[in-house]
């Protein structure tokens, strides 16, 4: 389930990156921060869950077999073309029984299942100090995996306290009041999933600190000053006992 790594996977300390549920919405600024941490001497590994792996498999097979033809059709018939795209992907998925669990992600919250996969993933490494670096839904997943012995600290950019188009979902926040390990949440003042000020509505453990920055939920194209602020926060968090 690893997407890639920088440095050695045999180091006694390791940063594990857990991204957004939508792998297409990555952040160049956060990628740059991760690379900067590696440049300062930290080994880094990316975690890729089964849901993301399956989504990439479907997208790859679709694009190779039908992508160009459907894309041309979609230009003139967007709604029908989009439905056709999803239907084709379903048939591709049916040909891969080991991936059928992907269907479940449509009907129920999959964060706990992904967190269980993350905990199993972490046990493959000899590292005694693992730092979880996450973005958005990756923050929910990493916080649910906090109890893993090797996990030392957590950091999340844009914890998704509340989906902007949905009612409150306790599964996103109820466990946060019970967290024990240091959890740094860096929250944008324009984050539609909740700002640092909005986070005060929830019961958070004393081990959680929420720091505001100027950003939206994408945390991309950070200004030079905000980027430097984030890098200093991360480096300080990693060096403190």
Regions found by a protein language model. Name each.
Residues 133-142:
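Gly/Ala-rich beta-loop-alpha elbow adjacent to hydrolase catalytic centers
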Residues 189-208:
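Conserved loop-alpha-helix segment in the C-terminal half of the alpha/beta-hydrolase fold
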Residues 1-127, 131:
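Serine-hydrolase catalytic machinery in alpha/beta-hydrolase-like enzymes
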Residues 22-24, 163, 189-194, 217-218:
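Acidic catalytic loop of the alpha/beta-hydrolase fold
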Residues 178-180, 185-187, 191:
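Short beta-strand/loop motif that positions the catalytic acidic residue
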Residues 55-57, 216-228:
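Catalytic histidine-centered segment of alpha/beta-hydrolase-like enzymes
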Residues 42-47, 205-219:
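Catalytic histidine neighborhood in serine/cysteine hydrolases
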């Amino acid at each position: 389930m690893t997407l890639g790594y920088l440095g050695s996977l045999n180091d006694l300390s390791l940063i594990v990156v857990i991204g957004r549920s939508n792998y297409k919405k990555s952040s160049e600024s956060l990628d740059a921060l991760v690379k900067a941490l590696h440049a300062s001497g930290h080994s880094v590994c990316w975690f890729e869950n089964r849901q993301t792996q399956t989504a990439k498999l479907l997208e790859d097979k679709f694009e190779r077999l039908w992508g160009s033809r459907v894309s041309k059709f979609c230009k003139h018939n967007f709604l029908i073309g989009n439905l056709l795209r999803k239907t084709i992907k379903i048939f591709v998925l049916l040909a891969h029984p080991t991936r059928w669990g992907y269907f479940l992600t449509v009907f129920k919250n999959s964060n706990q299942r992904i967190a269980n996969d993350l905990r199993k993933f972490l046990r493959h490494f000899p590292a005694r100090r693992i730092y979880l670096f996450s973005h958005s839904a990756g923050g929910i997943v990493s916080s649910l995996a906090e109890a893993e012995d090797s996990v030392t600290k957590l950091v999340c950019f844009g914890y998704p306290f509340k989906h902007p188009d949905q009612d409150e979902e306790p599964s996103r926040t109820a466990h946060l009041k019970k967290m024990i390990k240091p959890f740094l949440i860096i929250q944008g003042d324009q984050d539609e999933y909740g700002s640092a000020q909005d986070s005060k509505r929830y019961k958070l453990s004393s081990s959680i600190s929420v720091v505001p920055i100027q950003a939206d939920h994408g945390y991309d194209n950070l200004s030079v000053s905000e980027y430097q602020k984030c890098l200093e926060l991360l480096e300080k968090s990693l060096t403190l006992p």
